[in-house]
């Protein structure tokens, strides 16, 4: 049995010893059946939150309104969630009410896909009321119950379906795909932050080309930030070898290179990305558009290591040669890496010239910066002084 389950087993055993049902549920059970790596587990129980808190010494109310209590066991943290049913979904994401129950099957019934509605007990026996194992065997992504109802409850489930297709190389069953196509407009009610998470997971999947084909077939791109009408760009984007990526930044750079938005900053901000990512990708954009492989010393200097490394990463994804080592060597060989590395400062210029401060100081330092980069002058204080026409002291 997987070590992750074995380590968490005492949590289930404490709950069952206290007279409650407890199971491993969701993605961890699915991934176990698929022999995929399991990083963490989710636990569902018939114990109500207050009952869970009585059983364990160390607990945290991380989502108690929805029945989730985080418990600490053997220096590990586990989310333990009470079986529940949910009321109507008025905003296509959150239920109007949550009701705690004692039935495992009713709890599994509210989940998105049958492959995610399998439970495993403390003896590692599987409880599979919706034939999730059969779906896994057939590589099918099938909604629990009516697909249209599941998507109406949480519109993000449509994007999750496409993401699972990419990650698992599965296929949506016909009813689920039809419901996805007919209800795709509900995606507009989903927060951008949640969409961004699913988008990144989808791109990283081994079956990204098939996932992108389905995404475009159902016109999901219409409801993704800045991608309406970009079928051609997304087809190209989906054809690249994203298995070679090492950073998420490369995904965003690849997207702006194919879409070529009028305002790269605004496009990236619409995806609610961190400012650091927006700044890096925006700076790398013009270099990446040219599929730059050969760089002048001045270009390496102004771009910086983070930018030329990102452009090189995207080139690899697009089937070009990996020039990282050569570029890094050329960058390290530069006489300076920023204006701060110059052997003199504006204060030196004022002292040597006897003149007042003004725009000329920046202009002179810019000229010197270029001269040092082009090897016209060594970055040495006395040589710079002579080069600028000042007499040595």
Swiss-Prot record:
Residues annotated as binding Mg(2+): 40, 42
Binding-site positions, CTP: 27, 30, 111, 154, 157, 160, 163
GO molecular function, one term: magnesium ion binding
One of the protein's GO biological processes: tRNA processing
Keyword tRNA processing: yes
Database matches in InterPro entries: Bact_CCA-adding_enz_type3_sf, CCA-adding_enz_C, CCA-adding_enz_firmicutes, NT_sf, PolA_pol_head_dom, PolyA_RNA-bd
Catalysed reactions, as listed in the record: a tRNA precursor + 2 CTP + ATP = a tRNA with a 3' CCA end + 3 diphosphate; a tRNA with a 3' CCA end + 2 CTP + ATP = a tRNA with a 3' CCACCA end + 3 diphosphate
Presence of the UniProt keyword Metal-binding in the record: yes
Source superkingdom: Bacteria
Pfam families: PolyA_pol (PF01743), PolyA_pol_RNAbd (PF12627), tRNA_NucTran2_2 (PF13735)
Alphabetized NCBIfam families for the sequence: PRK13299.1
The protein's role, per its UniProt record: Catalyzes the addition and repair of the essential 3'-terminal CCA sequence in tRNAs without using a nucleic acid template. Adds these three nucleotides in the order of C, C, and A to the tRNA nucleotide-73, using CTP and ATP as substrates and producing inorganic pyrophosphate. tRNA 3'-terminal CCA addition is required both for tRNA processing and repair. Also involved in tRNA surveillance by mediating tandem CCA addition to generate a CCACCA at the 3' terminus of unstable tRNAs. While stable tRNAs receive only 3'-terminal CCA, unstable tRNAs are marked with CCACCA and rapidly degraded.
Note: A single active site specifically recognizes both ATP and CTP and is responsible for their addition.
Subunit: Homodimer.
Name of the protein in question: CCA-adding enzyme
Species lineage: Bacteria, Bacillati, Bacillota, Bacilli, Bacillales
Gene: cca
């Amino acid at each position: 049995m997987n070590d992750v389950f074995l380590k968490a087993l005492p949590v289930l055993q404490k709950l069952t010893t206290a007279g409650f049902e407890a199971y491993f549920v969701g993605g961890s059970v699915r991934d176990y059946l698929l022999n995929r790596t399991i990083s963490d587990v989710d636990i569902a129980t018939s114990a109500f939150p207050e009952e869970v808190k009585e059983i364990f010494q160390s607990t945290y109310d991380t989502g108690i309104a929805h029945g989730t209590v985080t418990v600490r066991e053997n220096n590990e943290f586990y989310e333990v969630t009470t079986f529940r049913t949910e009321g109507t979904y008025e905003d296509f994401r959150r239920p109007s009410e949550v009701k705690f129950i004692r039935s495992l099957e009713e709890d599994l019934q509210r989940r998105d896909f049958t492959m995610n509605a399998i439970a495993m007990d403390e003896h590692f026996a599987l409880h599979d009321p919706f034939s999730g194992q059969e779906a896994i065997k057939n590589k099918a992504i099938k909604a629990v119950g009516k697909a249209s109802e599941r998507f109406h409850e949480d519109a993000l489930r449509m994007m999750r379906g496409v993401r699972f297709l990419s990650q698992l190389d599965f296929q949506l069953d016909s009813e689920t795909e039809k419901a996805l196509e007919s209800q795709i407009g509900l995606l507009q009610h989903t927060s951008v932050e949640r969409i961004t998470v699913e988008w990144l997971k989808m791109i990283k999947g081994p079956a990204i080309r098939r996932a992108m084909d389905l995404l475009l077939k159902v016109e999901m791109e219409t409801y993704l930030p800045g991608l309406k009408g970009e079928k051609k760009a997304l087809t190209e984007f989906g054809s690249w070898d994203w298995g070679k990526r090492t950073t998420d930044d490369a995904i965003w750079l690849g997207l702006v290179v194919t879409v070529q938005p009028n305002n790269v900053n605004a496009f990236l901000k619409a995806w609610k990305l961190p400012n650091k990512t927006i700044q890096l990708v925006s700076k790398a954009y013009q270099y990446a558009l040219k599929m730059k492989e050969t760089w002048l010393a001045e270009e390496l200097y102004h771009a910086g290591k983070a930018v030329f490394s990102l452009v090189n990463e995207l080139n690899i994804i697009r089937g070009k040669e990996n020039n990282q080592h050569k570029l890094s060597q050329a960058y390290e060989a530069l006489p300076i890496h920023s204006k701060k590395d110059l052997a003199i400062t504006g204060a030196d210029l004022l002292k040597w010239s006897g003149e007042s401060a003004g725009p000329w100081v920046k202009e002179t330092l810019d000229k010197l910066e270029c001269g040092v980069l082009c090897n016209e002058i060594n970055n040495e204080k006395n040589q710079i002084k002579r080069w600028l026409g000042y007499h040595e002291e």
